[in-house]
Design a protein with these regions (language model features):
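Short, flexible helix-loop junctions that flank or precede catalytic/ligand sites
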Residues: 1-162
Length: 162
């Protein structure tokens, strides 16, 4: 499983980390980011609040109250030219399309996806708006509980979410 994750970090695609609220998604993601920093990757995060300060990572905090939302923050990606982008979540179709296009520009995207269980995930991803997302997932990490984490390869994700 670790090799699947490391391979996904080194190749363009979307790494999606799923789980229920407070399941440890952010902890797993920050671990992935630290692994990538150690490989000298240029990393940028777009998140509501930076939970930890990560050395050598461009961390960008969103603030809807002053109009600094995901759409505006995404413009900074072009200036930073990161290899890996972590985003906490996507709230608009336009943002999603933008981040999907980053994969075609050889970027790795790490994103959180809230799902209480596998059935919930399948239901949420069953809508046609997610077809492109599903095709770009290179690795999926699903946190069932603190003691149960499942890692899916691109092929397994495609079969499971079809």
């Amino acid at each position: 499983n670790l090799q699947v994750i490391k391979s996904a970090l080194n190749n363009p695609g979307i790494i999606i980390v799923c789980g229920s609220p407070l399941s440890g998604k952010t902890h797993i993601i920050y671990s992935l980011l630290l692994e990538a920093v150690n490989k000298s990757k240029n990393i940028m995060t777009l998140e509501s609040i930076a939970k930890y300060t990560l050395k050598d990572v461009h961390q960008c905090e969103l603030n809807e109250n002053v109009g600094f939302n995901m759409d505006k923050a995404s413009r900074f990606i072009e200036f930073q030219s990161p290899d890996i982008v972590y985003l906490e979540g996507i709230k608009s179709k336009e943002s999603f399309d933008y981040f999907a296009n980053l994969v075609f520009d050889n970027k790795t995207i790490i994103m959180e996806f809230l799902a209480n269980n596998m059935e919930d995930l399948r239901y949420k991803l069953s809508f046609s708006d997610f077809e492109t997302l599903k095709s770009l997932i290179s690795c999926m990490i699903f946190i069932h509980s603190q003691d149960s984490i499942e890692v899916f390869t691109k092929e397994t994700v495609q079969k499971y979410l079809a």
